[in-house]
Regions:
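Histidine- and aromatic-rich ligand-binding microenvironments
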Residues: 5-6, 37, 91-92, 113-114
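Short, well-structured N-terminal submotif of metal-dependent ribonuclease cores
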Residues: 1-36, 46-62
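Acidic, PIN/NYN-like endoribonuclease modules and their adjacent C-terminal/linker elements
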Residues: 1, 99, 103-130
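Alpha-helix capping/helix-boundary segments
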Residues: 9-10, 40, 76, 97-98, ...
């Protein structure tokens, strides 16, 4: 169990003035329960590289070090295939991969985009910015 933070949530944390509610909730989660995905890490690294701001890259590296990273492994790939072929044939591939990792590990997905993930059965979704 734990909380899986998606790209939108980690991007919010990296903002100059992040959501106070999100920061407060995040601070209350033990480090052992703070997770993200290898998909999210790649997305925020790409965004940081594109901005070419060294401070943002440093902030991303610090943020990634503060969470555990769940990989897209064989079990997640099996979940992905099931989700893609049953409930999400047209959904964004990265979103389906993130959902598959969350379902595989029984994580609660924390996102600023809950409606994008509500289609997945057995996936708990929360928005900590509200």
């Amino acid at each position: 169990m734990g909380y899986l933070f998606d790209t939108a949530t980690l991007a919010e944390v990296l903002r100059a003035v992040p959501s106070r509610l999100l920061v407060k909730r995040l601070a209350g989660v033990p480090t052992s329960e703070r997770w993200t995905t290898s998909i999210t890490v790649s997305q925020i690294l790409i965004a940081a590289r594109r901005t070419r701001h060294p401070k943002l890259m440093q902030d991303v590296i610090r943020l990634v070090a503060a969470v555990k990273v769940a990989p897209f492994d064989t079990l997640a790939a099996q979940s992905f295939a099931k989700l893609r072929t049953t409930v999400a044939p047209e959904a964004d591939t990265d979103d389906v991969m993130i959902a598959a990792i969350a379902v595989t590990h029984d994580f609660t997905l924390v996102t600023r985009r809950p409606n994008a993930f509500r289609i997945y059965p057995h996936l708990r979704v929360e928005d900590w910015t509200l």
